[in-house]
């Protein structure tokens, strides 16, 4: 660099009037004859100064700064588009995402069989994806996935036995529509109906109703396509142990290709929604659990409000009044007012005149409100109180088909942790379900957690699937399911990161203070794998206390010895030792 600069100076010097003067200076700098120490130092530092000035001049003229540079807006960095062969797959809350070059969509049982056989032979990953809705991204794998969206046919309906056989890629909503003409429907539903049937049974999904088991209990038989043993048929009669294990198999034992489900007659329900409080709930809890076919509580933190939702078949002897005291606009107007007030506080008056606000649903308004300051406890409390008032003004009845009534608007993108724990029997509820909630609400207030509403509490009967969180050999056992949430109402990466950190702090405190005391275990679609090695070891040991991990891993090694169906989450939850693998 120095030689180049000297050459440039020489060229400029030769063309200038004072070329001789500069030439002598350069010669002096480059001379090799010995000089006195002080003279040599002087010329050395003079050379450094010239070098610095030359570099600055070269930089200035090579990369000129535009005159309006100080007034230009920063342009955000834009990622290049993904290659055509790279698929981005995320769950519905966009909390987990992978990019993969292998996303297969077989359209038949033979095609699925061949795909798994090839992956097994080449030791490649091919994780069953389902609809990919699980909040924890349980089905995601960047190494490769298989989706059964093209295997979505109804294969047969037996109206007398009230059963239906379907390909596992059919969505719940599509299945319900297909069953309608036969006068049938499913026994129970989860909150949303976009799941594929194969996925909804594999993760132990559930609805609500202390007499109704999780959805995997509706499975009578199924065809499981495995990497090592091909397609196998399982039922209560054919290999019952593996059948019950595979019903809630987390996609680790095989890809569920076909399922026969027990249905019920299509029926209507009357939903009664009303607001209560903790004391009233305690007085009536046992009676409500036994009397109502479907029931759930929506607890609102920092208030004494409990929203009770009861659903039952219509009674010919009693017709409820369906008229409500308030219209939809009246019920939600105070939430709109809070939004306008909050905009003035956090933004400008101009934005408070947004005409779109009047078209937003309650859950959309709640998201808008939370976006303003999602982690400010006082702001969240104001929103929770507005929600309590909204439900008070929304009390009343509505009637519809069961699949319509049992759906629930969960709100926008969110983090969620749902635990399941025993609650006694239907004849003798132990009331620990209400104790759990009481402790949880006290913990939230003690720790100043900006916990939004609702905390949803539901119940189910037990399941005979040993990997189900509601698994029990006692037929009359009931289980309570409690979900805590934090919404992700914004696309701002920094804000989402802050909400995520606060949510995991919230979840950690509930785990430390509540889970062991109530034998609570997380829903498989909502369990998160800790990054800390010690915490992971504790989780693995804890899972072994509740679930038949050795039997599950043994079946995995028999049906999938090359771990084609596994992903990082499954491997961390259920690590297979070398000894187990060799066996």
From Swiss-Prot:
| Pathway annotation from the record | Cofactor biosynthesis; L-ascorbate biosynthesis
Mind telling me which GO cellular component terms the entry cites? mitochondrial membrane
Key word Transmembrane present: yes
Q: Where in the cell is it found?
A: Mitochondrion membrane
Sorted alphabetically, which InterPro entries does this protein's record hold?
Answer: ALO_C (IPR007173), FAD-bd_PCMH (IPR016166), FAD-bd_PCMH-like_sf (IPR036318), FAD-bd_PCMH_sub1 (IPR016167), FAD-bd_PCMH_sub2 (IPR016169), FAD_lactone_oxidase-like (IPR010031), GL_DH (IPR010029), Oxid_FAD_bind_N (IPR006094)
**According to its UniProt record, where is this protein mainly located?**
mitochondrion
Q: What intrachain disulfides are recorded?
A: none
Q: What is this protein called?
A: L-galactono-1,4-lactone dehydrogenase 1, mitochondrial
